[in-house]
Amino acid sequence: MGRDKEDKTEMDSVVPWMRAPVDVSNVENCALDTLPCLNPKLKKALENMGISSLFPVQVAVWHETIGPGGFERDICVNSPTGSGKTLSYALPIVQLLASRPVRCLRALVVLPTRDLALQVKDVFDAIAPAVGLSVGSAVGQSSIAGEISQLIKTPKLDAGICYDPDDLSQNLESAVDILVATPGRLMDHINNTKGFTLEHLRYLVVDETDRLLREAYQSWLPTVLQLTQTSDDSLFPSFTPFVPSAFGSLQTVRRQSVERGFKGKPYPRLVKMVLSATLTQDPSKLIQLDLHHPLFMTTGGSRYRLPEKLECLRLICETGMKPVYLVALLKSWEGEKCIIFTSSVETTRRLCKLLNFFGDPKIKAKEYSGGLNQSLRSKELKAFRKGDIQVLVASDALTRGMDVKGVTNVINYDMPPFAKTFIHRAGRTARAGQAGRCFTLLSNHEVRRFSKLLEKVGSDSCPIYPIPPTSLDSIRATYTPALEKLKELVESEAPKKGRQAFRHNSRTGNSQTKLNKPRSEA
């Protein structure tokens, strides 16, 4: 009875348009040859990517944008990791912009992290040039001046003639049709870049929506909505965002029913697409998006859903034995790609060092976390994708959206704190219809909490994965010297306070590092 009441309360808090979703699981894959209205040039580009058919979520979105739906409603997608959400919005946007008369910024894709934004840009880069579209990025990978030179086209000047800079700014044009951006750098261009305008924007994609709505990110969303609001919209406002009084160089706002350069042409409304594997159902957050008759697409009836071919497994051990169990797993997967997730940047660094101190030539681990600079993260991720390294030890910087082909195993070295964290971590494997496994290392006191987490994500089965005791005994002998090397490294690098904290963790078994000796050896 209590459970029924809880479910009813949760249902009452859901916005009405989410109560009757389109179930994507009822849609079948569709071969490119039978996909209606697909531009032949885009078909060729997709085939060059090795794509011969579209996944269900991609087919469903296509029919609501290019097909009978005709983008009459804003699209909201809640679909498992690895189901193909990026191409589900990239393909129809590129198809619709292929016939654009002149180049100007018409599509904006916003993502929470630089790594994810660069990955999405790669998808657009693979298909947009086939129909003559240009794609830019504003993610902070290069200097602001370098980005401006790629985003803004300056007029050619006659030599020997002096020009007023204010006159030149009136003739600046966009050099891109599609922009992939992170919120911070987007706001930099809105406030400071001459010639950067959202006046002609037609499509706004908010990827990883729940994370982008969780933080303000310099009020990027209300700013974008205000700058793309027409005078017609303001007659019946449904959303009143906060916008700073001035936007630096960006003074243009969307004009009423007329597009600049095409006199008399009706100005279409701004179409929005919001996507996530764990889309929020909080009305107070969703209202910020100012959605137009939104259509909700989801896979099944649950907010959280794991990939269909994912196998969940768990290992229960003493906290101090976690590294031993971890190495035993890695030894049994020679040549298979694996991502290990930890709870913090510091644990990621120490665990990576510890694995390499074991001295096993079959285990070559690299770190991927927010503690590394962008160039080093990109380097390690590239090596992992190429297969030069098989083991990546990661913080939650890699949990959302990152797509690495061939990852067959994911290990939660530290138990995920939330159901959505588990969804995003596990989703690094079993992508694009492939099989994969997710292992979670648990201490005895975490078993009950993990069982509740599994209920939330709808996992019916997560059996214990057996490891032969003989395998553990052989690894235990090399664990102690490896741990001693790690302690020496930490003490040589860390300040006095850090050394004291590490000694304290080693004595008390603090779960922040979980890299202390087995109790039998303590």
From Swiss-Prot:
The annotated region (Disordered) lies at 490-522
Bias (Basic residues) = 497-506
User: Motif Q motif at which residues?
Assistant: 30-59
Keyword ATP-binding in record: yes
Identify the CDD domains for this entry. DEADc_DDX51, SF2_C_DEAD
Gene3D superfamilies reported in the protein's UniProt record: P-loop containing nucleotide triphosphate hydrolases
Record's keyword annotation contains ATP-binding: yes
What is the top-level taxon of the source organism? Eukaryota
Query: Cross-referenced SMART domains, in alphabetical order?
Result: DEXDc, HELICc
Q: Which molecular function GO terms apply here?
A: ATP binding; ATP hydrolysis activity; DEAD/H-box RNA helicase binding; RNA binding; RNA helicase activity
Q: Which residues bind ATP?
A: S79, P80, T81, G82, S83, G84, K85, T86
Q: Fill in the domain comment.
A: The Q motif is unique to and characteristic of the DEAD box family of RNA helicases and controls ATP binding and hydrolysis.
Q: What is this protein called?
A: DEAD-box ATP-dependent RNA helicase 1
Q: Which organism is it from?
A: Arabidopsis thaliana (Mouse-ear cress)
